[in-house]
């Protein structure tokens, strides 16, 4: 294992997991499993519809742990959490599937998605087209592409794999340079992560600085560091109506009630 940044270590481990996975399932196997899934729920469409209604488009995250905070929620029931989120106004769900660093699991995603009618984003570190078809095979409706973890060639390859698999894409950036790279793709939704994945430090100003550089016909989702109604108001006053929030909900006894209190 390398001694680089947290992101470097995650990607190195992910590449090992993919190599192991390919020995169990070929790309052909995953394509067949993906094609057997019911049609994906429209992740992008749900977000745009919420914003068109004048409401915040909340992607509510199901996350047990993180590298920087350790275990966030001991009492972890993804089905119960998913239902509470849906009942309290979430537009979409995000489910962590990385096991090594976030204590996630693909079974959590399957269980959560089967319990609700909301579109579900697979929150993981996608670096290989094999994972894109794996994502659809497990039932997810959208994937996350983290620009900091990918070359331009990888982004292009993964974006087109997602189109083939029938997945929507949330492209995540943290800097002006990453945003410029992301805009080379025909993306509709741009996630601006206020947390630097190399250091795990968080600044809400990251979204406020980068959002004006996103074309007006794109939807911006601010990610990480949203904890108070003042944070929400700050974003909405600046024309940002998409939110991805996890930790703020996961630390509360009732994550759904926490969502409602923060946004509605």
Residue map of PLM features:
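Catalytic cores of alpha/beta
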Residues: 127-138, 174-185, 222, 226-245, ...
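Glycine-rich phosphate-binding active-site loops on the catalytic face of alpha/beta enzymes
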Residues: 134-154, 191-200, 240-259
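C-terminal helical cap(s) of enzyme catalytic domains, especially alpha/beta-barrels
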Residues: 209-213, 236, 251-264
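Active-site beta-loop-alpha junctions enriched in small/polar residues
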Residues: 13, 61-65, 98, 125, ...
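An N-cap/entry alpha-helix motif that binds or orients negatively charged groups
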Residues: 2-73
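N-terminal active-site wall of soluble small-molecule enzyme domains
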Residues: 62, 69-170, 176-181, 207-210
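Conserved, mostly hydrophobic/aromatic
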Residues: 10, 60, 85, 93, ...
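Catalytic-face loop-and-helix region of soluble metabolic enzyme cores
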Residues: 189-245
């Amino acid at each position: 294992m390398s001694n680089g940044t947290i992101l470097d270590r995650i990607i190195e481990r992910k590449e090992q997991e993919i190599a192991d996975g390919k020995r169990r399932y070929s790309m052909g196997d995953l394509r067949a499993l993906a094609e057997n899934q019911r049609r994906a729920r429209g992740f992008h469409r749900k977000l745009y519809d919420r914003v068109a209604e004048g409401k915040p488009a909340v992607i509510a995250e199901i996350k047990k742990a993180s590298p920087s905070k350790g275990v966030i929620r001991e009492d972890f029931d993804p089905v119960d959490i998913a239902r509470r989120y849906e009942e309290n106004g979430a537009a979409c769900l995000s489910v962590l599937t990385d096991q090594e660093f976030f204590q996630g699991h693909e079974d959590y995603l399957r269980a959560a998605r089967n319990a609700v009618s909301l579109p579900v984003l697979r929150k993981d570190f996608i670096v290989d087209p094999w994972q894109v078809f794996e994502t659809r095979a497990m039932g997810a409706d959208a994937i996350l592409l983290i620009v900091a973890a990918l070359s331009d060639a990888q982004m292009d390859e993964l974006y087109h794999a997602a189109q083939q698999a029938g997945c929507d894409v949330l492209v995540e950036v943290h800097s002006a340079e990453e945003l410029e790279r992301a805009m080379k793709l025909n993306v509709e939704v741009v996630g601006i992560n206020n947390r630097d994945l190399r250091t795990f430090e968080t600044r809400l100003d990251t979204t406020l600085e980068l959002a004006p550089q996103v074309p007006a016909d794109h939807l911006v989702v601010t990610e990480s560091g949203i904890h108070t109604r003042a944070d929400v108001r700050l974003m909405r006053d600046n024309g940002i109506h998409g939110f991805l929030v996890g930790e703020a909900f996961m630390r509360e006894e009732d994550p759904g009630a926490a969502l409602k209190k923060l946004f509605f």
